[in-house]
Amino acid sequence: MSSELSMRIRALLLSNLMSELVRFGVSLEKPLLDRFDVLTRAKQYTNRSEALRDLIRMELVQQEWKSGSEVVGTITLIYDHHKRDVLIRVMDMQHDFQEAIICTQHIHLDHHNCLEIVAARGKAEEVQKLADALRSIKGVRHATLSMSSTGREIE
């Protein structure tokens, strides 16, 4: 197959995969636009459109979480595995929420501290309950929930 034909086929496939782009105008106060441009550069976006798309997607993900849709998230825990029963309580809690947990990863940071990453999927309320339950375990030093989308509701 010639390279020109290969490039045409690739371009056709990519054009079918991408949504139709629509241009629209946005009116902003100059100081707000200046701050947005600083943010856009700081986050290394190639242009304002990419930055704006990400802001819209972040809002759509938040709406998914508020509406009770099926969502995904990662829960990151830091704990001292030498603390009495903390590892057992973390594992017990994971078993209690086994329907929501996709996978876990356990990393030894140093002699005392462990990093546990829990990937979860389910109704937003259930994933939030799992994060709260893990966060509340005595001996967990830090816990965060990173909320995301299954991708079905956002383009």
Map each language-model feature to its residues.
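Short Lys/Arg-rich basic patches
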Residues: E4-S27
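Short glycine-/aliphatic-rich beta-strand segments at the starts of folded cytosolic domains
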Residues: S69-H81, L115-E116
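Short amphipathic alpha-helical segments
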Residues: V26-L28, F36, T46-R57
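Short amphipathic alpha-helices in soluble, non-transmembrane regions
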Residues: R89-M93, K129-S136
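Helix N-cap motif at beta-to-alpha junctions
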Residues: H82-K83, A120-V127
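Short amphipathic alpha-helix segments
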Residues: D80-I101
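Conserved short beta-strand edge segments in small beta-sheet-based binding/regulatory domains
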Residues: E99-I107, D132, S136-G151
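Short, charge-rich, low-complexity interaction segments located
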Residues: L52, V61-G68
